């Protein structure tokens, strides 16, 4: 086995976020408010199942333990179940998760679980059906809620729910969210609104620090949990009176990048060292044959030497990220 992926700042990388499409059928205000528009970048098509098999095999050989399938909306791929199974061929990968808008979850949760999926994250930015419609552009609140129930029925022990925290939209709804998770094994993760190339005006209007919620949670007796090495960036809190948990993802907080453990590959096979970095390193030419695996691992390892110590969001430098559907948020 090749050596564990490590960068110049001694950070080890156990977690791959793999985008398999940038197409999405929702029009969320903070991501694709005008809907999905095909770009020239996808002219060669998205990664095939065989290419996905090869890239995840290389990352598994380099110490990756967790793969999250992202988009766009991953379940729009007709071969999504085959993709899950292909990633699962790697014994070293212990967790295979998906981030989804949930619109196909009620129909497909059981088949995804059977294919090897171990974790589900569902985007839900409001528990009010009308506000959900206003944020997403889709009147699918009840369908998404049914999907979460279906995930539990399919055998998922916990469901993670992602909620983008927005001032004057949902930041004042903490009590509603807490009541929802009190009897349910849901980890509700509030994600600070992040500035993107296309979303600067929205950011200035609606950004609020997660620190506000953290202070309130601590005041109410919530307890901060320790992170595991392949966990994402959320600070997780639990409370003895709640079955559910709260997570806070605060990319503007000091030292957010110090514990970075994840890399990203786009839906067209580019390795991105940071969600808000520049450029990216193409891997696709080395995904065409199994015999290329050693060269692929070398390219990934070499690229990691260029990973910066931190992002530059504080200077409003969003890198190449025009919207969050591009490399999977």
UniProtKB/Swiss-Prot annotation:
[4Fe-4S] cluster 2 binds at residues 257, 260, 274. Pathway: Cofactor biosynthesis; molybdopterin biosynthesis. S-adenosyl-L-methionine binds at residues 30, 72, 123, 194. It holds the Pfam family Radical_SAM. It comes from Salmonella heidelberg (strain SL476). [4Fe-4S] cluster 1 binds at residues 24, 28, 31. GO terms for biological process: Mo-molybdopterin cofactor biosynthetic process. GTP binds at residues 17, 68, 99, 160, 262-264. Its EC number is 4.1.99.22. It catalyses: GTP + AH2 + S-adenosyl-L-methionine = (8S)-3',8-cyclo-7,8-dihydroguanosine 5'-triphosphate + 5'-deoxyadenosine + L-methionine + A + H(+). SMART domains: Elp3. Catalyzes the cyclization of GTP to (8S)-3',8-cyclo-7,8-dihydroguanosine 5'-triphosphate. This is GTP 3',8-cyclase. InterPro entries: Aldolase_TIM, Elp3/MiaA/NifB-like_rSAM, MoaA, MoaA_NifB_PqqE_Fe-S-bd_CS, MoaA_twitch, MoCo_biosynth_MoaA/MoaC, rSAM. Its cofactor is [4Fe-4S] cluster. Residues 8-234 form the Radical SAM core domain. GO terms for molecular function: 4 iron, 4 sulfur cluster binding; cyclic pyranopterin monophosphate synthase activity; GTP 3',8'-cyclase activity; GTP binding; metal ion binding; S-adenosyl-L-methionine binding. Binds 2 [4Fe-4S] clusters. Binds 1 [4Fe-4S] cluster coordinated with 3 cysteines and an exchangeable S-adenosyl-L-methionine and 1 [4Fe-4S] cluster coordinated with 3 cysteines and the GTP-derived substrate. Belongs to the radical SAM superfamily. MoaA family. Monomer and homodimer. Keywords: 4Fe-4S, GTP-binding, Iron, Iron-sulfur, Lyase, Metal-binding, Molybdenum cofactor biosynthesis, Nucleotide-binding, S-adenosyl-L-methionine.
């Amino acid at each position: 086995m090749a050596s564990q992926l490590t960068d110049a700042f001694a950070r080890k990388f156990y977690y791959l976020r793999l985008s398999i499409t940038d197409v999405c059928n929702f029009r969320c205000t903070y991501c694709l408010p005008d809907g999905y528009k095909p770009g020239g970048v996808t002219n060669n098509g998205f990664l095939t199942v065989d290419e996905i098999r090869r890239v995840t095999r290389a990352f598994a050989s380099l110490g990756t333990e967790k793969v999250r399938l992202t988009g766009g909306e991953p379940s729009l791929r007709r071969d999504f179940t085959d993709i899950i199974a292909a990633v699962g061929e790697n014994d070293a990968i212990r967790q295979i998760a998906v981030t989804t808008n949930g619109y196909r979850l009620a129909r497909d949760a059981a088949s995804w679980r059977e294919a090897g999926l171990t974790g589900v994250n569902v985007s839900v930015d409001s528990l009010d059906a009308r506000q959900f419609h206003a944020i997403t552009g889709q009147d699918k609140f009840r369908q998404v809620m049914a999907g979460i129930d279906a995930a539990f029925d399919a055998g998922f022990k916990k469901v993670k729910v992602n909620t983008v925290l927005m001032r004057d939209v949902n930041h004042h709804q903490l009590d509603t969210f807490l009541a929802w998770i009190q009897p349910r094994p849901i980890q509700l993760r509030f994600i600070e609104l992040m500035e993107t190339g296309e979303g600067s005006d929205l950011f200035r209007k609606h950004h609020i620090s997660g620190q506000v919620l953290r202070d309130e949670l601590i005041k109410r007796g919530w307890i901060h949990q320790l992170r595991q090495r392949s966990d994402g960036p959320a600070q997780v809190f639990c409370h003895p009176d709640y079955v559910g948990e709260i997570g806070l993802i605060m990319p503007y907080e000091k030292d957010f990048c110090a514990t970075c453990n994840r890399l990203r590959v786009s839906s067209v096979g580019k390795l991105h060292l940071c969600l808000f970095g520049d450029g990216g390193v193409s891997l696709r030419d080395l995904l065409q044959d199994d015999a290329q695996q050693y060269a692929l691992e070398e390219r990934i390892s070499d690229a990691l030497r260029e990973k910066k110590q931190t992002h530059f969001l504080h200077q409003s430098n969003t890198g190449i990220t025009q919207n969050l559907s591009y490399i999977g948020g």
